[in-house]
Amino acid sequence: MSGNDTASYAVTDTPLPPLPDQDPLNTQQWNILIAIAEAVVPPLTRTDASKTNRLLAHPLRRDVYDSAVTRIQRLSKIQDADDATVTAYLAEGATSSPEFRELISRMVALHMSETARNGLLFILSALSTRAGSLLLTGYATPLDGLSLKEREQVLLGWNRSRLPLLRGLSRSLAQLARVIWLRTSPTVGRLLGYTHAPIFDQAAPAGFPFTFVQIPQSSSPEPEVIETDVVIVGSGCGGVVAAKYLAEAGLKVIVVDQSYYWSPEHFPMAENQAGNHLFGNGGVVISTDGSISVVAGSTWGGGGVINWSASLQPQGYVRREWAQKFGLPHFNGSAFQADLDDVCSRMGVSTDHINHNKGNKVLLEGARKLGWSAKAVAQNTGGAVHDDGFCTRGCRSCGKKGPTVTFLPDAAEAGARFIEGFEVKTITFDEADATKTTGVRGTWTSRDRAGGVAGKDRVTREVVIKAKRTIVSGGSLYTPILLQKSGLKNKHIGRHLHLHPVNMVAAVWDEDVRPWEGPILTSVVNEFENLDGDGYGAKLECTTMLPSSFLPLYEWKGGLNFKEFTMKMRRMTGYISLARDRYGGRVYPDPKDGRLTIDYSPSTYDKNHILEGVIRLAELMYVEGAREIYTAIPGVDGFVRPSADADAKVSLSSNSSPSITDSDFVEWTKKVRANGLPTPHTPYFSAHQMGSCRMGTSPKNSVVDYRGRVWGTQNLYIADTSVFPSASGVNPMVTCMGIARGIARGIVHEERSQPESPVAVDTKARL
């Protein structure tokens, strides 16, 4: 594929809901935020300093500017003499696009807690005063009155500050500015050859024709009442398996979700839209101390829509831990294995027909050379080829057999009903018996007349669903919030949250890579997964390589440095050191506004495992011939392989196996180890959430019993990753599905034991 290749189809637009009428920032606060963002990603010019407004552009000496142009041309492989695109690229600032203000407004107004929003606005206001600026920058001039170069030096100074507040502030603001610029820049994609979508010859399939219950308009204040046997809250990986099994067993099932269904022609969804339509909280939830960024699916189909296709079953040592340490012997049994095998069979999980891209090949080949354990990762792609590096924003081809392609259609065909746009506010209980659930109550919001969610002509109704049984499948972040808002008091609700924290490594190669092409995660190095002998360590894997998701996680070292680093992405591969975290955190509703709040900081124990994984990844990249190696650890420069010939192609030889005992490289790894993972400005990332309503043997140590029944209640169940007793150590999707199937089997067994049950004794679920 040439650098000018683009997707041969149009992705259907998915407009966002309107912003609040009131601007979340005042004029002074906007001026300061723009001044900071422009210092992070500055307009760079080649001009006489006397002719440049230094507040609006950062002039570079002619030789520095010309050298930068040459390097960017080489990195982007522009062959012609026309450097207009490079000039435009350098001249762009973070706020050049009119989308900047809209994206910031949406984030501040809709996706920040009141506490975080007030903190940000306070800092921005302080920097707009002489006194505040003097205290925070050392200049007695408001920040927006400083030149771009001076502002850059202020931010770099914050990076090195002894005050954790300033280090954390610098990281957060630099990350935000880079994310928005990478999403909105008109030149980054052209120079990288980044297509924004996979190249397919065929049109997107139509997708399953879901029918959703529509609540009629009414002038009455009384809620709409719907009755069913089972209501399932959440359409993610746990809820959909339960829905299929129960519907096929003959029960009347309704699945509700606060989000909406988007058909394949909307995929891969534009990044600025995907954050709102496919992910929770606008794309990311940040922990209270800012240490970890958590992404979770929030759409019809849940996390299975954005999963990277990796489909791993829980390993033996994890199952033994759950059976022995947590008193749950069924996890070591054949029935649980059958549940795992059945859900994998439905999705066509296998390692057949995988076309490993460069990044995944490097892991397998590097591990082989070093004698480390590694393997291909099974994919839920129906046993077919699935070369899609963008399906973290939805799978256009339906090659990924997620919930909207498999279990939800199966449930529909068995008679299940669906309601989208239904936010459950509380679980309801019988007035005569406060332990007995009677269903759920919440607010339903229709689509607009155009079939989207951006219009203002949307119907809102209160709805009560009366159900004999209620299953909560909102995921580890949202399930405990619903239980707490519904009045449940078990002290374990929301606690023991595990996140599989990761840190990143980037390798730069001499050849063109285009890391967004091909499947995302098809190999794993598991040599270091059991570093403590107790089942805890780090796995080494590839990660999604979309520019705005990957590049901002690395330390910002100045505007020109970042723009040159961005151009290297065309030749990059990216990796994660993923820890099976032994120690957890908690999730709870913000006491001021009820918003989801995550209290989690990676423990020293788990950070040691992450760091070990980072160093081992670097060793593997070196052995495979990477030209440059970067960690997402502040205070550590990248390793650049010395070479007398700048055009040497050290990574092209399949027989190139340089020794990791090279003195320069060894010294660099020692520096990485000595530097450690400093707090609070080392970034961590999580795409797996587990354990916040864990399963156990008693309400003294857990929230649910071995059949998913919530302690102290009747007919209330949880079927999602929140019931994991501890971290799974692998992508939790398959484990979640297997557990949900077992919980559904238990419900069917209970139904069959009751007189006049709708479930016939000889009925067999077809899963």
Language-model regions: role of each:
Residues 2-31, 35, 39-41, 47-118, ...:
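Extreme N-terminal leader/targeting segments of oxidoreductases
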Residues 135-139, 143-173, 181, 300, ...:
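Rossmann-like flavin
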Residues 172-218, 330-430, 437, 632-668:
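Conserved redox-cofactor binding core of oxidoreductases
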Residues 221-255:
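N-terminal Rossmann-like FAD-binding beta1-loop-alpha1 element of flavoenzymes
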Residues 245-272, 293, 299, 413, ...:
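Glycine-rich loop(s) and the adjacent beta-strand/alpha-helix scaffold that form part
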Residues 251, 258-317, 359-368:
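N-terminal FAD cofactor-binding segment of flavoenzymes
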Residues 383-386, 391, 428, 439, ...:
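A glycine-rich dinucleotide-binding beta-alpha-beta segment and adjacent secondary-structure elements
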Residues 490-621, 628, 642, 648-651, ...:
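FAD cofactor-binding and catalytic pocket of flavoenzymes
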